[in-house]
UniProtKB/Swiss-Prot annotation:
It comes from Homo sapiens (Human). The keyword Secreted does not apply. GO terms for molecular function: D-mannose binding. This is Protein ERGIC-53-like. Residues 31-252 form the L-type lectin-like domain.
């Protein structure tokens, strides 16, 4: 048997020990879309409101399909930052971007940030000059033609400010060379932080659905929750259009352990146990149905019917209570009105006046004839009013009897579900009628009247006085008209004869107007 020597066995043993703990060989994590940390088109930005849950800064221009961080102008910078912090410890970000410009040399580039604090616009690719977190830089500076364009992952603790991505203030974790300028289609960058490792893959952008290619894998890297996502861009002496079409964020979590399939006997046992519980529940309710086991659909239908029956009975009980209360109120109102009006043809207890069957007033006790005459004139109106009130009382009595009959029928029969609102409307209408009838009764009760004296006559104007004043006004009007006509005739006669009366002429503006309009005759002296 040949002997094994050298470092080969030790290296294989180390690989065997590390393989179970490798995150790549385990189950993929569960992804959950986080809409408050994402944006995409169409209708990416709301008119006048910006991007939901995001803020834009600098020279960023919001559109319906994309966010243009910097236009193709020199010395411009713009950024977008999430308003909400990241509450989870593992995440994945998919960013779709496009960088276009003239020539082979590009502007400064773009950056994707995950930092402890929200930034606005800074000197490092439009982002923060001093940050606590990581930044993925898409560099395309015109000065570095050898290593440009490139993608770099930098980390910083926020203590030393940085002016450029490679000035030494930040720690470079990894990089790869990737030409992302002037692609036929927008390129996608997938950044995954899982198991304290940061991985990034990109597609070429030559076709809309290119597969992703590996770029950077750094770790161990500790990124605490509570940070903010951001994307920034900047231009220098040369200008490019830096566009972000979508920014999708997913939270990652451990997959839940799969439930092993239960054996057939255990499933049957659980099903029988559920049926037994249902039977005991039905027996406890006191139902008379057959206790033979039924299918799940039939049991569910029976439970729904039982629930509907209980709900219907409860509604019927409430309807009966409302009808009883309404009947009591109607009876009380009827007693009050009968007490106030009394039956037809019977004298009232106060001796005010007596009514016959036709609600007329044959006699009225009083001490003067003029009071009897005024009351006899208004007796027809008062009788009509009392007759209308008596008719209304009879109608209310009929409605109360109908309500009592409906309550008696509801006790022995089931009403269809959904008619409760009709009784509520009836109760409301009868309540309004009762309130309207209580108003005159309260007014009559509050008005004090000595016993034996009829109600006071109306305080309105007497017809005789009204006719007297009308006659005086008519006579005066006709007298005035006759006087004006006579005056006009006398003036016309004077003008026709050419001689004026010796007496003083009356001062009337209309007569003078007629005099001015008449031409002077030739025989009148000047």
């Amino acid at each position: 048997m040949p002997a094994v020597s050298g470092p080969g066995p030790l290296f294989c043993l180390l690989l065997l020990l590390l393989d179970p703990h490798s995150p790549e060989t385990g189950c993929p994590p569960l992804r959950r879309f986080e809409y408050k940390l994402s944006f995409k088109g169409p209708r990416l930005a709301l008119p006048g409101a910006g991007i939901p849950f995001w803020s834009h800064h600098g020279d960023a221009i919001l559109g319906l399909e994309e966010v243009r961080l910097t236009p193709s102008m020199r010395n411009r910078s713009g950024a977008v930052w999430s308003r909400a912090s990241v509450p989870f410890s593992a995440w994945e970000v998919e960013v779709q971007m496009r960088v276009t410009g003239l020539g082979r040399r590009g502007a400064q580039g773009m950056a994707v940030w995950y930092t402890r604090g929200r930034g606005h616009v800074g000197s490092v690719l439009g982002g923060l000059a001093s940050w606590d977190g990581i930044g993925i830089f898409f560099d395309s500076p015109a000065e570095d033609t050898q290593d440009s364009p490139a993608i770099r992952v930098l980390a910083s603790d926020g203590h030393i400010p940085s002016e450029q991505p490679g000035d030494g203030a930040s720690q470079g974790l990894g990089s790869c060379h990737w030409d992302f300028r002037n692609r036929p289609h927008p390129f996608r960058a997938r950044i995954t932080y899982w198991g304290q490792r940061l991985r990034m893959s990109l597609n070429s952008g030559l076709t809309p659905s290119d597969p992703g290619e590996f770029c950077v894998d750094v770790g161990p890297l500790l990124l605490v929750p509570g940070g903010f996502f951001g994307v920034s861009a900047a231009t220098g002496t040369l200008a490019d259009d830096h566009d972000v079409l979508s920014f999708l964020t997913f939270s990652l979590s451990e997959p839940s352990p799969e439930v092993p399939p239960q054996p057939f006997l255990e499933m049957q046992q659980l099903r029988l146990a559920r049926q037994l519980e249902g039977l005991w529940a039905r027996l406890g309710l006191g139902t008379r149905e057959d206790v033979t086991p039924k299918s799940d659909s039939e049991a569910q239908g029976e439970g729904e019917r039982l629930f509907d029956l209980e709900e219907t009975l409860g509604r019927h009980r409430r309807i009966l209570q409302a009808l009883r209360g309404l009947s009591k109120q109607l009876a009380q109102a009827e007693r009050q009105w009968k007490k106030q009006l009394g039956p037809p043809g019977q004298a009232r207890p106060d001796g005010g006046w007596a009514l016959d069957a036709s609600c007329q007033i044959p006699s009225t006790p009083g001490r003067g004839g003029h009071l009897s005459m005024s009351l006899n004139k208004d007796s027809a109106k008062v009788g009509a009013l009392l007759h209308g009130q008596w008719t209304l009382l009879q109608a209310l009595q009929e409605m109360r009897d109908a309500a009592v009959r409906m309550a008696a029928e509801a006790q022995v029969s089931y009403l269809p579900v959904g008619i409760e609102h009709h009784f509520l409307e009836l109760d409301h209408i009868l309540g309004l009628l009762q309130e309207e009838l209580r108003g005159p009764a309260k007014a009559a009760a509050k008005a004090p009247r000595p016993p034996g004296q009829p109600p006071r006559a109306s305080s309105c104007l007497q017809p005789g006085i009204f006719l007297f004043y009308l006659l005086i006004q008519t006579v005066g009007f006709f007298g005035y008209v006759h006087f004006r006509q006579e005056l006009n005739k006398s003036l016309q006669e004077c003008l026709s004869t050419g001689s004026l009366p010796l007496g003083p002429a009356p001062h009337t503006p209309r007569a003078l107007g007629i005099l001015r309009r008449q031409p002077l005759p030739a025989s009148m002296p000047a």
